[in-house]
Swiss-Prot record:
Pathway: Carbohydrate degradation; 2-deoxy-D-ribose 1-phosphate degradation; D-glyceraldehyde 3-phosphate and acetaldehyde from 2-deoxy-alpha-D-ribose 1-phosphate: step 2/2. The gene is deoC. InterPro entries: Aldolase_TIM, DeoC, DeoC/FbaB/LacD_aldolase, DeoC_typeII. Keywords: Cytoplasm, Lyase, Schiff base. It comes from Enterobacter sp. (strain 638). Catalyzes a reversible aldol reaction between acetaldehyde and D-glyceraldehyde 3-phosphate to generate 2-deoxy-D-ribose 5-phosphate. It is an enzyme of class 4 (lyase). CDD domains: DeoC. The keyword Lyase applies. One of its GO terms (biological process) is 2-deoxyribose 1-phosphate catabolic process. This is Deoxyribose-phosphate aldolase.
C-alpha cells in the first residue's frame, strides 16, 4: 500500500461528508447519505442543514449505516454575536436529532476586540450539547481572522469554553482551510495539553487525496500517527470523497460538489 493510498483510506473514514448549499433538497441529502457508504468503508459523518436531519437519519438507518454520525451547523455561516439565537438554533438542532453541532464562533466580535462574547456563546452551546451527549465543533473562520494571534486566540477561547473540536472554516468565505492555519490550531491543542479531549477539523478547500495527506501529516507530526482518529480529526469536505475513492481504485475522481 502506497503512502497516498494509506492516507486516503484514513482520510475517507475521517470525512464529514458535507452539503451546505442554499438549493439543498431531500433528494440531495439522500444522495449524500448513499455516498457516505463506500466500497472501502463509511465516512465518519454527514454534515447537513438541521431541517434535513430526519431524512438523513432515515436514509442512513435504511442502508445499514446507523454508525455514520449526523452533524449540522448553527450560527452559520455569519458567526454573529447573538448568543440567544445561536443557543436557540443549537437546541433546535439537538431536537432534530443531531449527533454533532458545528457552531460558528463570533469571529468579527473577536476582531473588534471582544473576547468575552465568543466564550459565552460557545459555553452556552456546549452546555446544551453536553446535556444531550452531542459533540460540539467550533468554527473559528481562520480565513477571516487572518492573523496568527487571532487564530490562536479564537482557538484558545473555544477550547476553554468547552469545544470538543475546533474547525477552521465555514467553506463560505474566500479563504478556507490552509496548512498554515491547521498547524496553528493544532499547536494550540498541543500547547494547552488537551489533545486527549479536543479534536481538529479542517473544512473547505481540502479537495484532493494529496491535500488530505498534507493535512494528516501535520497532525502526525504534532501528535504521532495514532492521534488522528474520528474522535480527534475530521475533514469537512464533499469533493474530496471522489478523489480519495479514485486513489483507492474506485470511481473516476469526479464530483458534483466544490466544498
Amino acid at each position: 500500500m502506497t503512502d497516498l493510498t494509506a492516507s486516503s483510506l484514513r482520510a475517507l473514514k475521517l470525512m464529514d461528508l458535507t452539503t451546505l448549499n442554499d438549493d439543498d433538497t431531500n433528494e440531495k441529502v439522500i444522495a449524500l447519505c448513499h455516498q457516505a457508504k463506500t466500497p472501502v468503508g463509511n465516512t465518519a459523518a454527514v454534515c447537513i442543514y438541521p431541517r434535513f436531519i430526519p431524512i438523513a437519519r432515515k436514509t442512513l438507518n435504511a442502508q445499514g449505516t446507523p454508525d455514520v454520525r449526523i452533524a449540522t451547523v448553527t450560527n452559520f455561516p455569519h458567526g454573529n454575536d447573538d448568543i440567544e439565537i445561536a443557543l436557540a438554533e443549537t437546541r433546535a438542532a439537538i431536537a432534530y436529532g443531531a449527533d454533532e453541532v458545528d457552531v460558528v464562533f463570533p469571529y468579527r466580535a473577536l476582531i473588534a476586540g471582544n473576547e468575552q462574547v465568543g466564550f459565552d456563546l460557545v459555553k452556552a452551546c456546549k452546555d446544551a450539547c453536553a446535556a444531550a451527549n452531542v459533540l460540539l465543533k467550533v468554527i473559528i473562520e481562520t480565513g477571516e481572522l487572518k492573523e496568527e494571534a487571532l487564530i490562536r486566540k479564537a482557538s484558545e477561547i473555544s477550547i476553554k469554553a468547552g469545544a470538543d473540536f475546533i474547525k477552521t472554516s465555514t467553506g463560505k468565505v474566500p479563504v478556507n482551510a490552509t496548512p498554515e492555519s491547521a498547524r496553528i490550531m493544532m499547536e494550540v491543542i498541543r500547547d494547552m495539553g488537551v489533545s486527549k479531549t479536543v479534536g481538529f477539523k479542517p473544512a473547505g478547500g481540502v479537495r484532493t487525496a494529496e491535500d488530505a495527506q498534507q493535512f494528516l501529516a501535520i497532525a502526525d507530526d504534532l501528535f504521532g500517527a495514532d492521534w488522528a482518529d474520528s474522535r480527534h480529526y475530521r475533514f469537512g469536505a464533499s469533493s474530496l470523497l471522489a478523489s480519495l475513492l479514485k486513489t483507492l481504485g474506485h470511481g473516476d475522481g469526479k464530483s458534483a460538489s466544490a466544498y
